[in-house]
Amino acid sequence: MTESYALFVAFVLGIVEGLTEFLPVSSTGHMIIVGHLLGFEGPKAATFEVVIQMGSILAVVAVFWRRLFGLIGIHFGQKPPQDHATLSLVHIILGMLPAVIIGLGIHSWIKANLFGPETVMYALVAGGILLIIAEKFRPTVRSETLDDISYKQAFGIGLFQCLALWPGFSRSGATISGGMLMGISRQAAAEFSFILAVPMMVAASGLDLYKSRDLLSMADFPMFAVGFITAFVVAMIAIKTFLALIRRLDFIPFAIYRFIVAFAVYLVFVA
């Protein structure tokens, strides 16, 4: 791979990562397809994906930095009253706990058995079905904003997040759907999903980077930098656009799109 082509690949995959990481469409499925079409696969590609994923994480931090600082008691501007319930670090810990416990136990097994195109294809379909169920059967909204989310709801979202251990299911799709099925508004569920992503993805990406540290070299720095910066910028735009859209649109189009991507995976890799 020439240096110019490597930078082109980094730019394209950075766009794909930034667009799909926080939408309920599965970034894994898209990265598998686009990586295959670009001829960029294997251990180095997997390490590159982890690095540019960190760019997407940084975008969430940039969008929700006030909320993230608030979780650790640092407030900018007017501090909320003491008797006013707000999103806290406890909510995030409860949301993380199930996936952390299960993920640590089966991380190696997932890497060895669930990263194939066929299993990702099934996950795309299953995640699409869950989105439809969440839209069609969600109960009356009891938690309209982030600060209305209860500890029980946060833990329930954490249980749904375990579904995203199945590559292709979509972490945001699982957590947003779970939140909606527990009476959280679409907007609040999406915002909680994004904030919850920061510690979860930092932990998962950090573990993957540590395990693949031997594959990192200064020669790859330009490619990794282009992918990282592109993913950061595109993810910033995608997050803000997505949060604006879901105020007036439901998730059915995303479910249909997932089925289309699953069919594309079938045609390219399975048929």
UniProtKB/Swiss-Prot annotation:
It is found in: Cell inner membrane. One of its GO terms (molecular function) is undecaprenyl-diphosphatase activity. The chain crosses the membrane at residues 5-25, 45-65, 86-106, 114-134, 149-169, 189-209, 226-246, 251-271. Its main location: membrane. GO terms for biological process: cell wall organization; peptidoglycan biosynthetic process; regulation of cell shape; response to antibiotic. The keyword Nucleus does not apply. It catalyses: di-trans,octa-cis-undecaprenyl diphosphate + H2O = di-trans,octa-cis-undecaprenyl phosphate + phosphate + H(+). InterPro entries: UppP. Pfam families: BacA. It is a multi-pass membrane protein. Keywords: Antibiotic resistance, Cell inner membrane, Cell membrane, Cell shape, Cell wall biogenesis/degradation, Hydrolase, Membrane, Peptidoglycan synthesis, Transmembrane, Transmembrane helix. GO terms for cellular component: plasma membrane. The keyword Endoplasmic reticulum does not apply. Its EC number is 3.6.1.27. Catalyzes the dephosphorylation of undecaprenyl diphosphate (UPP). Confers resistance to bacitracin. PANTHER family: UNDECAPRENYL-DIPHOSPHATASE. Bacitracin is thought to be involved in the inhibition of peptidoglycan synthesis by sequestering undecaprenyl diphosphate, thereby reducing the pool of lipid carrier available. Belongs to the UppP family. This is Undecaprenyl-diphosphatase.
